[in-house]
């Protein structure tokens, strides 16, 4: 039992409200309210409205360490210049970095190009749909692989970042170090066990 400030959790809902005691005896108690909260308040984002594997991959890389509002114009401009994996694989680095200019963390752009080259040579230009295959691409870690697999390919894969780890640690009164890779792997496994297959 822990006290969650600012959250009201019920059978079918999760709202921001007054502090209430929350009993999290098992993670499956929070899945349904979280999904209902998402359905009610989700943001309309271009990469979610047309969630092709390329669009989701590009957006997830751009969103690393960058605010959503800052990414939107770059995302649109990038897709106009490089609309698919092949054009990304073939672009000159100078043009790529010019398109990326202002987003920072330029290795993200370089890894996108490297990964696009690998997708073209090893997968015929089709971004692989399996989580394990996505992890083999440069610049794609477990969070990004989970996001691509779940959003673009409808797979039951969590996308666990620091926010998810912190929230679950608080809900479960778990004092393990969330920076420990073993803790993240454990949380990913726990979440796979409660994720609904119809979402």
Residues of each region from the PLM?
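Catalytic cores of DNA base-excision repair glycosylases
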Residues: 13-28, 33-199
């Amino acid at each position: 039992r822990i006290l969650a400030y600012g959250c009201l959790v019920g059978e079918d809902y999760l709202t921001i409200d007054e502090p209430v005691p929350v009993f999290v005896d098992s993670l499956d108690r929070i899945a349904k309210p979280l999904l209902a909260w998402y359905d009610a308040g989700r943001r309309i984002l271009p990469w979610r409205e047309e969630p092709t594997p390329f669009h989701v991959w590009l957006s997830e890389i751009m969103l690393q360490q960058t605010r959503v509002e800052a990414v939107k114009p770059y995302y649109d401009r990038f897709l106009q210049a490089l609309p698919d994996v092949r054009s990304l694989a073939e672009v000159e680095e100078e043009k790529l970095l010019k398109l990326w200019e202002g987003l920072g963390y330029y290795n993200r752009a370089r890894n996108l190009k490297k990964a696009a080259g690998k997708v073209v040579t090893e997968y015929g230009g089709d971004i692989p749909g399996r989580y394990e295959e996505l992890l083999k691409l440069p610049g794609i870690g477990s969070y990004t692989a989970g996001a691509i697999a779940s959003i673009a390919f409808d797979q039951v894969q969590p996308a666990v970042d620091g926010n998810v780890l912190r929230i679950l640690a608080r809900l479960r009164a778990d004092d393990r170090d969330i920076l420990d890779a073993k803790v993240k792997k454990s949380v990913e496994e726990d979440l796979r066990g409660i994720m609904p297959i119809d979402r």
